[in-house]
């Protein structure tokens, strides 16, 4: 069967790109190839796409999936990203992923352009924001999940022909979720900054949604998993104050509106010195954004504003082992936060370090840590670089924790789509239990290379087993790769 010539060209070009990117570059050393890792991190997002895939899709083992999402609610909820190694669309981590993709794009724009990856970054971001726009059909309605998480996790099926139920879950005034609405507002506002130079109309649309969602979050307090209990066992929320601060900080940066700055100034809780920066804890992100305002002289270096800045710097000093409550390190030098999926916290901490280094350099200032030591911008960037080097292979196991980077990387990440033969190679349906029998329990490497994925990482003693069943250490997710993308751009 013949095809339109342009489509054939795109397909051939895509195959060539993927083949080239799958060729490894030899043993990993301290001299990591950050540009290569940056390129591959963006490919990971293409592997996580849900919905109708575009003609320029570069990860060719994936196919269209979940094309009826939202039909139960008579809303188009196709698109977006699967959060990790399952076939779920969880709105809470998806919104945080979107915010971090946007922050990476805004903060590291020149570096991304220098490596010819700015366009791919905006494409990854737009795949998320297009979905979030559809998920917000009314001012006080936001769809926060597609799929039954318990039923999804009970099956091992690729997304292209999964048969698990796809119910849609939403928050509204009767079923509030200020954390989910606030995080989505932050995502929309941050993304508006990324798109403003190239698509002002789209940026205005995003700002409009962000403003509505912020008001929705303020007017109807509460944690979202009380309204969407199905999410509670997977992405439970610890509160919503941080999301409101985070959203206010991004809306102020995007609009300059004093209203949002007032929210930051009048907030009763600035978060204190945080122990992590993650999908459930955005206090540090808000603190870093306020510190930027202080450095630039846009707010006075006093009161609540200096409190935000001081708390951000306490976190940084703790990462640098010069604070009151230093972050633990593995024997190999990895910042160690929590046993489950530790690299997500390493990635976000490294992003905070790299971003704060940029702010310090621009202000020609430094950080005075509690032990009396002074941290320069270069110290922060060097620490972030050391963490990336560890992730890319400069560690006791000499293993890259980015799939497809180097020669020694995880071959069995906990990921349904990657671990099951591509539907393009074998269209025979994979059943719920059949997937476990034929693929999950198969000791062989995954048949599809999940290029650019970052697994959960080693344990606190630098050990890693590369077992598909070890989801605590072996499952990649979007909330890790989005911030790491920004760090890679900063140091490439």
From Swiss-Prot:
Q: Where is the active site?
A: 86, 414, 466, 475
What processes does the entry annotate via GO biological process terms?
A: cell wall organization; cellulose catabolic process
PROSITE patterns to which the protein is assigned, alphabetical:
GH9_1, GH9_2
The record's listing under InterPro entries reads: 6-hairpin_glycosidase_sf (IPR008928), 6hp_glycosidase-like_sf (IPR012341), Glyco_hydro_9 (IPR001701), Glyco_hydro_9_His_AS (IPR018221)
Enzyme Commission no: 3.2.1.4
List, alphabetically, the SUPFAM superfamilies matched.
Six-hairpin glycosidases (SSF48208)
A GO molecular-function descriptor: cellulase activity
GO cellular component: a single term: extracellular region
Where can this protein be found? Secreted
Q: Which residues form a coiled coil?
A: none
The family assignment reads: Belongs to the glycosyl hydrolase 9 (cellulase E) family.
Supply the name of the protein. Endoglucanase 15
């Amino acid at each position: 069967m013949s095809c339109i010539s342009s489509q054939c060209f795109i397909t051939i070009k895509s195959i060539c790109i993927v083949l080239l990117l799958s060729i490894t570059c030899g043993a990993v050393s301290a001299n990591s190839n950050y540009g290569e890792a940056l390129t591959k991190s963006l490919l990971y997002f293409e592997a996580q796409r849900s919905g109708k895939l575009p003609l320029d899709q570069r990860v060719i083992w994936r196919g269209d999936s979940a094309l009826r999402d939202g039909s139960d609610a008579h809303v188009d909820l196709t698109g977006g990203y699967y959060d990790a190694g399952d076939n779920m669309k969880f709105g809470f981590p998806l919104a945080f992923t979107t915010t971090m993709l946007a922050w990476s794009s805004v903060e590291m724009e020149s570096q991304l352009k220098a490596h010819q990856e700015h366009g791919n970054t905006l494409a990854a971001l737009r795949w998320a924001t297009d979905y979030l726009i559809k998920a917000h059909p009314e001012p006080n309605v936001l769809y926060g999940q597609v799929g039954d998480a318990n039923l999804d996790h009970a099956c091992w099926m690729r997304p292209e022909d999964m048969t698990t139920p796809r119910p849609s879950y939403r928050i509204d005034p009767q079923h509030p979720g200020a954390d989910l609405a606030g995080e989505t507002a932050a995502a929309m506002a941050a993304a508006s900054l990324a798109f403003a130079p190239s698509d002002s109309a789209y940026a205005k649309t995003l700002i409009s949604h962000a403003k509505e969602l912020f008001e929705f979050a303020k007017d109807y307090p509460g944690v979202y998993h009380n309204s969407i209990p199905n999410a509670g066992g997977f992405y439970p929320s610890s509160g919503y104050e941080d999301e409101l601060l985070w959203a206010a900080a991004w809306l102020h940066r995007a609009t300059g509106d004093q209203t949002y700055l007032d929210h930051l100034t009048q907030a009763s809780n600035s978060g204190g010195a945080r122990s992590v920066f993650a999908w459930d804890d955005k206090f540090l992100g808000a603190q870093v954004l306020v510190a930027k305002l202080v450095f630039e002289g846009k707010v006075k270096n006093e009161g609540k504003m200096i409190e935000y800045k001081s708390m951000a710097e306490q976190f940084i000093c703790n990462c640098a082992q010069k604070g009151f409550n230093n972050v633990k390190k593995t024997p190999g030098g990895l910042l160690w936060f929590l046993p489950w999926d530790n690299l997500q916290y390493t990635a976000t901490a490294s992003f905070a370090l790299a971003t704060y280094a940029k702010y310090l350099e621009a202000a020609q200032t430094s950080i005075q840590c509690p032990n009396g030591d002074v941290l320069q911008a270069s110290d922060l960037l060097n620490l972030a670089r050391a963490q990336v080097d560890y992730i890319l292979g400069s560690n006791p196991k000499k293993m890259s924790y980015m799939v497809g980077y180097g020669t020694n990387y995880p071959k069995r990440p906990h990921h349904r789509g990657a671990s099951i033969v591509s539907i393009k190679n074998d269209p025979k349906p994979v059943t719920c239990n059949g997937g476990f029998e034929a693929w999950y329990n198969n000791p062989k490497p995954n048949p599809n290379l999940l290029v650019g994925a970052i697994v959960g990482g080693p344990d606190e003693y630098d050990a890693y087993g590369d077992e598909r069943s070890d989801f605590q250490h072996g499952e990649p997710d979007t909330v890790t790769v989005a911030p790491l993308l920004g760090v890679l751009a900063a140091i490439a």
